C-alpha cells in the first residue's frame, strides 16, 4: 500500500485553475482586441442554458462525491470508485461541467478569443490531470476501474 505522499494522481495543476486561467487569458485578449462572434441575443440564448446545465452538473458531481464519502481533489487519496450519479454517464463530470461553464461564460461575454482558446483547457486537463488520474486509479483499483473505464466514456 503506498503512503499518503504516493497515494494520489499527481495532477499538474488544479483543474479549476487550468480552466479559470485559460478563460481569463481569453477574456483579456478579447478586451484588448474586441471581437464578437455571435449576435447578442443568440449569445444569451445559448449561454444561459449552457451555464445553468454546467452549474447543475457540477452541483450533482459535488453532491455525489460527498454522499459517496470520497474526495474530489487530485491531491488526496481516493478511497473508492464512484459509479453513481453523473459518473454513470461520464468518468469526468467535473471537467465536463467546467468545460460547459467556460463555454457559457465565453459565449455570454461574446468573447471570440476566449472561444478560440477553449480547447486549451480540456486538452491540458486531459493530458496533465485525467490521464494521470486514470493511471493512478488503474494502479490502485485494478480490474474494478478497468471494468468501469470500459463501460463509461471519458468525457461524453
Residue spans of the language-model regions?
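Extended, alpha-helix-rich binding/interface surfaces that flank or overlap catalytic cores
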Residues: 92
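Solvent-exposed interhelical
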Residues: 87
Amino acid at each position: 500500500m503506498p503512503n499518503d505522499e504516493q497515494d494520489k494522481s499527481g495532477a499538474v495543476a488544479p483543474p479549476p485553475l487550468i480552466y479559470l486561467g485559460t478563460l481569463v487569458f481569453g477574456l483579456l485578449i478579447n478586451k484588448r482586441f474586441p471581437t464578437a462572434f455571435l449576435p447578442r441575443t443568440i449569445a444569451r440564448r445559448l449561454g444561459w442554458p449552457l451555464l445553468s446545465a454546467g452549474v447543475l452538473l457540477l452541483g450533482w458531481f459535488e453532491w455525489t462525491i460527498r454522499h459517496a464519502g470520497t474526495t474530489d481533489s487530485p491531491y488526496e487519496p481516493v478511497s473508492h470508485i464512484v459509479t453513481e450519479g453523473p459518473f454513470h454517464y461520464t468518468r469526468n463530470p467535473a471537467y465536463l461541467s467546467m468545460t460547459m461553464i467556460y463555454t457559457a461564460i465565453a459565449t455570454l461575454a461574446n468573447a471570440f478569443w476566449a472561444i478560440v482558446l477553449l480547447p486549451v483547457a480540456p486538452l491540458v486537463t486531459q493530458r496533465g490531470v485525467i490521464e494521470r488520474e486514470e493511471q493512478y486509479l488503474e494502479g490502485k483499483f485494478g480490474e474494478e476501474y478497468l471494468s468501469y473505464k470500459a463501460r463509461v466514456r471519458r468525457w461524453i
